[in-house]
Amino acid sequence: YNENIIKREKKEEVWEAQKYRDENGKLILKRVVNRSPMNQNKEVRGDKRYYFQASLDYNRLFAHAHRVGVFGMVYQEEKTDVNFDSSDLIGSIPRRNLAYSGRFTYAYKDKYLAEFNWGCTGSENFEHGKQFGFFPAVSAGYVISEEAFMKKALPWIDQFKIRASYGEVGNDVLDGRRFPYVSLIDTDDGGSYSFGEFGTNRVQAYRIRTLGTPNLTWEIAKKYDVGVDFSFFNGKISGALDWFLDKRDDIFMQRKHMPLTTGLADQTPMANVGKMKSYGWEGNIGFTQSIGQVNLQLRANFTYQTTDIIDKDEAANELWYKMDKGFQLNQSRGLIALGLFKDQDEIDRSPKQTSNRPILPGDIKYKDVNGDGVINDDDIVPLGYREVPGLQYGVGLSANWRNWNLSVLFQGTGKCDFFIGGNGPHAFRSERYGNILQAMVDGNRWIPKEISGTTATENPNADWPLLTYGNNDNNNRKSTFWLYERKYLRLRNVEVSYDFPQTWTRKFFVSNLRLGFVGQNLLTWAPFKMWDPEGTREDGSNYPINKTFSCYLQISF
């Protein structure tokens, strides 16, 4: 494909309100962005791709009982970027993949099922001798509902199938690098030798810019799955439930545990050293029922998943909670907040907290996890869940009565936390003036009695700490004080429609006429109230998800 992009843009002036007003009470404004005239930029992108694919498929039923299937395929792909930098030799080299795959299936009376798949995939991203990887997969199923004793004892069961599978999948996209087994050598990055008494004579030299990884191989994901499929009461109830486990071995990542004697302190090599596992449950269920002229359909689905780090070449640490091994991928980490300091006496009696400013009453108090009397990075611990939801679910309802139709969809997440921060929650942290979150300033904040006139505002359990101007290293640190649940349940979609009778529409040569109303993102239930918890930045500066209302008229002739 080829893509030509022409951008024309100009910037208008941006002014910022200052801290003080003039003698007449008017805001003092300062220009922070100058106006720029219209300018034009052109960008060209594109690539060339070649595909070749050939396959052979064979299926046959023997003796009315043995169903056999055989499939084979060869696939080749080449992709060349056409807009690489003229000096980029690697960028000019095509990306090539070659794969052979096959499948064998067998079923006996559609009761006992077996399948074997294999793939032999080659990638030019690996050195000679390691370019191809073999990735097998096998699965088996037992449709127990096809047994005569089940049909006799439990006739209300339409289908009940037990299944299990195991397979391996390879990945050759390693950190986005081309030919990562090759070391890149050049004369850039200050590579030189110094000569002379004071080292003033410097001679250009070659330098390893990127260290290659010998014996690099495919990342391998081993996937396990056990599940059931079911259908009861002539299809009124149906669904599936699965338990899954994905174990990823030989993950391509940077080595972190290498002695300084190797001379690689500032550039440790990449290697197949990482291991992770993801496991969880997923399922869906549907219910269909007719009550008189009303037809109902209820459906629900969920996915629950956890991803743990098994190994990432870390150095041993006596503070076990400082390691990534054994914790979730992208685990949230921070200090444990113990409320707010009540007075100076409490500050003096507590473990020492360091900051870019003196610790004052109303500042956040932290737990000394390792007991050394000082609050520092050694007291940062894993906290809560990660930002990516561990639980996702949805519930839908459909109903129709005569010519009326109703559809409702709920969607939600759980098992996820996030830190709030930035210029919104930490008001005035950048020594700037402008929009701030009103809830952060006017809410339940710790306020000195000298300002409020009452000791009631010196509350160690207040929602917000002492308000300060400029950055506050103590209060702005990630901690349980700023950690919130990100779970929510949203009424994602509601649709109501009416189908006009065809006996009436045909008079106007219309076969179908539907009038409908659609509402999206109408309601949200969440413990976090300050802004929309779905997909927002830590400071809430994302544009919120809109509620939308629309009507439509659908006509078919």
What is each stretch, according to the model?
Residues 1-10, 28-330, 474, 478-557:
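Extracellular/periplasmic, surface-exposed regions of secreted and cell-surface proteins
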Residues 18-31, 358:
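Charged, glycine/proline-rich intrinsically disordered loops and linkers
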Residues 22, 413-509, 513-514:
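Extracytoplasmic gating/loop element in the C-terminal half of outer-membrane beta-barrel translocons
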Residues 178, 183, 187, 192, ...:
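Conserved small-residue
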Residues 386-421:
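Glycine-rich, aromatic-lined ligand/substrate-binding cores of catalytic
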